[in-house]
Every structure is written in C-alpha cells, then in structure tokens.
C-alpha cells in the first residue's frame, strides 16, 4: 500500500495543495489541524481540484463549478459523484496518507 509521510507545516492552511505520488495527483486540504486527501481530479471532467477555490469548507472545481465538502468528499452539486477520501492520520505534526 503506497504511503506518504510529510510534516503538517508543509501543507498550507485552508488552501488546496497538490502533491504527486507514484504518478498519481493528490489534493490535500488542511483545516484546523485536520488534513483531508483526495485524488486531484473532479469526477465530472477530470479538472484538477487543486486549482479550485476553497471557501467555508467547500472546494469548487474550476471546470464547471461542481462543489465538494472537504470533510466528507460529498459532492454538493451532484451527490452521486462524490470524492472518495484517502486514509489520513495526523500525529505529532506528521501527516501519513495511505491508499490502495
């Protein structure tokens, strides 16, 4: 299982952060010492979510305006097209992300 380990301070606060790992684009979102991670791709037209705007816990895709709750990945525009959150653990200012 691929794993990323980085410092919490490497992830900007309340701003989408793009990270490439093993050829896969990821978007990390840090809010109140919580970090969420998703594949950096809108399910609608595959625009990078890291280029989108983050406001009030919602990230908006720049392509067609689809909006996603960053805590759950739920699409607020078309609920059947939600994002699948990756497993994230924050411990002692370290962030570990795993996915299959």
Positions of PLM-derived features:
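N-terminal pre-ligand scaffold of iron-sulfur
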Residues: 1-56, 74, 84-100
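Glycine/small-residue-rich loop that forms an oxyanion/phosphate-binding "nest" at active or ligand-binding sites
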Residues: 79
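Short cysteine clusters
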Residues: 42, 61-64
């Amino acid at each position: 299982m691929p794993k990323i380990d980085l410092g919490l301070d490497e992830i900007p606060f309340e701003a989408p952060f793009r990270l490439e790992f093993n050829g896969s684009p990821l978007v990390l979102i840090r809010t109140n010492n919580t970090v969420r991670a998703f594949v950096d791709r809108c399910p609608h037209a595959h625009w990078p979510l890291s280029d989108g705007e983050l406001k009030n816990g919602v990230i908006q895709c720049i392509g067609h305006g689809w909006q996603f709750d960053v805590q759950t990945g739920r699409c607020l525009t078309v609920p059947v097209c939600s994002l699948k959150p990756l497993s994230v653990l924050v411990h002692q200012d370290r962030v570990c992300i795993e996915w299959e």
